[in-house]
From Swiss-Prot:
It comes from Listeria monocytogenes serotype 4b (strain CLIP80459). This is Dihydroxy-acid dehydratase. Binds 1 [2Fe-2S] cluster per subunit. This cluster acts as a Lewis acid cofactor. Its EC number is 4.2.1.9. The gene is ilvD. Its cofactor is [2Fe-2S] cluster; Mg(2+).
Length: 564
């Protein structure tokens, strides 16, 4: 066993003494059992994580029943909704790397035989995923699960995105204070990840088709007994993985990454999943995975399930309608959309996992014969503003908008843009350009949920577009193009756009262009000032120095002279 490194031999007597002191070694035979890490992310200020201590206790009990010795450790978490719109958001994406590094550190320092990961919210799941393929120790994931949708006094289903959009409506005078406060109080009624197909739930759904979590992981409610049952089931599967020495890199292959994007297309997941899945491919050693490949997948996968913020349906509605398994079963039956014979943590293939799945509500999950769209709900755009690509959640765009042409109004920060939207400087026909908010420029590639929500909340969702080298919350909808790469801070051409330039967003042709000649853009480049980092000390300064643009997944790049 891997853990023999710390518990076998005369030389490890001091280590054994310390292990006895933990209280986890309850009999002499325990030293002969697999040591299983529980990588938890319990934290009181994140509603998606307040119940994870309880879930870890369920996992510990099941691991002991299955013949392992559990050792729990914790990592950090950032709540993107609470960190939104201020300096806290600059720490959100960088927290992914902290989580990956922290988990790697504990797992490798203590030679665990297996790892049970318990994530839930936005950057925690991808951070743990990066750690799982980096350490490549047998592992399984079981998230904390989504919260229930809220309900307004008027009987309207609510999610967190409802509140963000209500801010714009209230500021604009189109919502009463009574309705505004009612929405604030009732949008998030339980613990769990936010109730729509936002980033957290998108990632937790993708875990099922990646093969790293059991069916039900993405949609089973946080407050349900079924969530505890999933934890127990996952613990027993993990012990089988340890026994058979099946590792994350055996499961997360190039085909698995393809299938993750296929499910993403079918369910209209968050654009943040693109960032995280590209980073996962890089960490897993999968070469030549680019945005064009994602577009190729989108062209062969139909859009089957439109969930909040793109509709009023919540994750619980998806669960009741058949869950992720029902969507995946449609893709299996479609033929050629995914690779269904890959192995998963259950010991079965994707095909076997979903063999008995069916759609229970065709309003929530459309059958493959009647999709929302014959192509996927995410799209990668290319053009002279985004030569390395950009991302848009086309499932969140009004279907009447296929091509948007408008006049650029440019801002060098999130806050400048929000102020201009609030004071009505931004008007119909504008393309709001927010740059220097990418991974390096932000730093941390903050989410632009406040400006997009204000635009939609004011009823301008079809009349104003927003493009940025920053990113969006999974709660974003409207004509919102993010992840523009290279970013402005890396000299990307988004930095060369001027007020009044005409920008065209062409969804059918997947292009994003400014109507300015290459010669003019090169002249403008000569006048472009050198980027200066906004943060000079601490973690964000180190992050700025190492991070790359969105087309890589926003990974940290080790200087070549250190690895040659």
């Amino acid at each position: 066993m891997r853990s023999d490194k710390i518990k076998k031999g005369v030389e490890q007597a001091p280590a054994r003494s310390l292990l006895h002191a933990t209280g986890q070694i309850k009999s002499p035979g325990d030293m002969d059992k697999p040591f299983i890490a529980i990588c938890n992310s319990y934290i009181d200020i994140v509603p998606g994580h307040v119940h994870l201590r309880e879930l870890a206790d369920v996992a510990k009990e099941a691991i002991r029943e299955a013949g392992g010795i559990p050792f729990e450790f914790n990592t950090i978490g950032v709540d993107d909704g609470i960190a939104m719109g201020h300096i806290g958001m600059r720490y959100s994406l960088p927290s992914r790397e902290v989580i990956a590094d922290a988990a790697e550190t504990v797992i490798n320092a203590h030679w665990f035989d297996g790892v049970f990961y318990i994530p839930n919210c936005d950057k925690i799941t991808p951070g743990m995923l990066l750690a799982s393929v980096r350490t490549n120790v047998p592992a399984i994931f079981c998230s904390g699960g989504p919260m229930k949708a809220g309900l307004s006094a008027h009987g309207k289903a609510l999610t967190l995105s409802s509140v963000f959009e209500a801010v714009g409506a209230f500021k604009d005078g189109s919502m009463s204070q009574e309705d505004f406060l009612d929405m604030e109080a009732n949008a998030c009624p339980t613990c769990g990840s936010c109730a729509g197909m936002f980033t957290a739930n998108s990632m937790n759904c993708l875990m099922e088709i990646l093969g790293m979590a059991v069916p039900g992981n993405g949609t089973t409610l946080a407050v349900s007994d079924a969530r505890r049952d999933l934890i127990r089931e996952s613990a027993f599967h993990l012990m089988d993985l340890v026994k058979k020495d099946i590792r994350p890199r055996d499961i997360i292959t190039k085909d698995a990454i393809d299938d993750a994007f296929a499910l993403d297309m079918a369910m209209g997941g968050s654009t943040n999943t693109v960032l995280h899945t590209l980073a996962l491919a890089n960490e897993a050693g999968i070469e030549d995975y680019d945005l064009e490949r994602i577009n190729d997948i989108a062209k062969r996968v139909p859009y089957l399930s439109k969930i909040a913020p793109s509709s009023s349906y919540s994750m619980h509605d998806v669960h009741e309608a058949g869950g992720v398994s029902a969507i995946v079963k449609e893709l299996v039956d479609l033929g050629g959309a995914i690779h269904p014979d890959r192995i998963t943590v259950t010991g079965k293939t994707i095909r076997e996992n979903v063999a008995d799945a069916k759609i229970n509500n065709t309003d929530v999950i459309h059958p493959k014969e009647n999709p929302y769209s014959p192509v996927g709900g995410l799209s990668m755009l290319f053009g002279n503003i985004a030569p390395k690509g950009a991302a848009i959640k086309v499932g969140g765009v009004d279907p009447s908008v296929q091509v948007f042409k408008g006049e650029a109004i440019c801002f060098s920060s999130h806050d400048e843009a929000v102020e201009a939207i609030d004071n009505h400087t931004v008007r119909e026909g504008h393309v709001v350009v927010i740059r220097y908010e990418g991974p390096k420029g932000g730093p941390g590639m903050p989410e632009m949920l406040a400006p997009t929500s204000s635009i939609v909340g004011r009823g301008l969702g079809k009349d104003v577009a927003l493009i940025t080298d920053g990113r969006f919350s999974g709660a974003t909808r409207g004509i919102a193009v993010g992840h523009i790469s290279p970013e402005a801070a890396a000299g990307g051409p988004i930095a060369l756009v001027h007020d009044g330039d005409i920008i065209t967003i062409d969804l059918p042709n997947r292009t994003l262009n400014v109507d300015v000649s290459d010669e003019v853009l090169e002249e403008r480049r000569k006048e472009l000032p050198k980027f200066k980092a906004k943060v000079k000390t601490g973690y964000l300064a180190r992050y700025t120095a190492l991070v790359t643009s969105a087309h890589t997944g926003g990974i940290l790049q080790i200087p070549e002279d250190l690895i040659d």
